């Protein structure tokens, strides 16, 4: 009972913060994209349009909930709920500061990678249950892409695990703090591992240039083709949460988390996460989409061998007494 109460006391604020941050991230992306395209972006709802995401949610809640006549209704309704839940669940083990963390477990890295893989289940459910060929093809592409890019993601995440000697995210941050992570990057495979993890995160979150599962010119809207209203909104929200949490996890694994000059704390974690979040959308609005063959060749021909070399380099660095 005490464990359940502890989880609720720490989990509910984390969920609230994640959802609020996702809404602000959506507003930020629109303003950021508008700047790139010489537009103004949202301006009408709230100061500088900051309440536009809230208006979008209210609009989606009022829309009619439609399901195809031949769809598997139970799985069709369940898929967006599970997709959103899996995306939020990853935030439970992310240490935003030494004290702001819902669950500081010893296998935090394993938990993050495992829950990230679970998102494939509701994605496939949504595509199959829709009884729509475009949704099914989008789901198949999403599964193939995620399974492929999970390999370099896992291998690149092993680099800080090997260096820190722990799978706890908090321990990895403390290791980086003790060894001055910004000074060690030139001497260990941290920087290339960060680049590989970042690219894999883009692919896992279906962000441009890796968004072939929902390529509008080919698949209308991918797995969300038949979804309307808030069910569509849950899939949409899950993508943004996934992107935000991926930025936070990358900050913890490779950028020192809450550690920083002068006064380490939550503010450094927020700054690093926002910078990565902004860079993801800078890439999105600057590059074109890969073809399927190019995407798979990049993964298996370049990223997987490079990540294997980095794991071996990290092990050799530790063996040579680099810790």
Task: Describe the predicted segments one by one.
Residues 1-323:
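Selective transmembrane helix interface/packing segments
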């Amino acid at each position: 009972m005490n464990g359940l109460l502890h989880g609720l006391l720490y989990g509910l604020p984390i969920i609230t913060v994640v959802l609020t941050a996702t809404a602000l991230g959506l507003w930020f992306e629109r303003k950021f994209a508008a700047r790139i395209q010489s537009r103004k972006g949202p301006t009408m709802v709230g100061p500088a349009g900051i309440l536009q995401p809230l208006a979008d949610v209210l609009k989606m809640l009022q829309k009619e909930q439609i399901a195809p006549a031949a769809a598997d209704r139970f799985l069709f309704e369940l898929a967006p709920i599970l997709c959103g839940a899996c995306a939020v669940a990853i935030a439970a083990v992310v240490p935003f500061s030494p004290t702001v963390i819902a669950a500081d477990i010893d296998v935090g890295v394993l938990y993050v990678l495992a829950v990230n893989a679970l998102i494939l289940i509701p994605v496939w459910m949504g595509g199959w249950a829709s009884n729509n060929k475009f949704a099914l093809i989008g789901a198949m592409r999403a599964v193939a892409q995620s399974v492929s890019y999970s390999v370099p993601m896992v291998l690149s995440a092993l680099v800080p695990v090997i260096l820190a000697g722990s799978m706890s995210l908090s321990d990895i941050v403390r290791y980086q703090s003790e060894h001055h992570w910004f000074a060690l990057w030139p001497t260990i495979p941290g920087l290339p591992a960060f680049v590989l993890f970042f690219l894999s995160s883009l692919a896992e979150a279906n962000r441009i240039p890796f968004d072939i599962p929902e390529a509008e010119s080919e698949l209308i809207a991918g797995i969300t083709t038949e979804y309307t209203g808030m069910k569509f909104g849950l899939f949409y929200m899950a993508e943004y949460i996934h992107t935000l949490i991926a930025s936070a996890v990358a900050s913890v694994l490779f950028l020192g988390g809450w550690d920083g000059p002068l006064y380490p704390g939550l503010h450094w974690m927020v700054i690093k996460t926002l910078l990565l979040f902004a860079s993801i959308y800078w890439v999105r609005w600057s590059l074109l989409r890969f073809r399927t063959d190019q995407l798979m060749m990049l993964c298996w021909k370049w990223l997987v061998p490079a990540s294997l070399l980095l794991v071996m380099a990290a092990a050799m660095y530790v063996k040579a007494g680099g810790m």
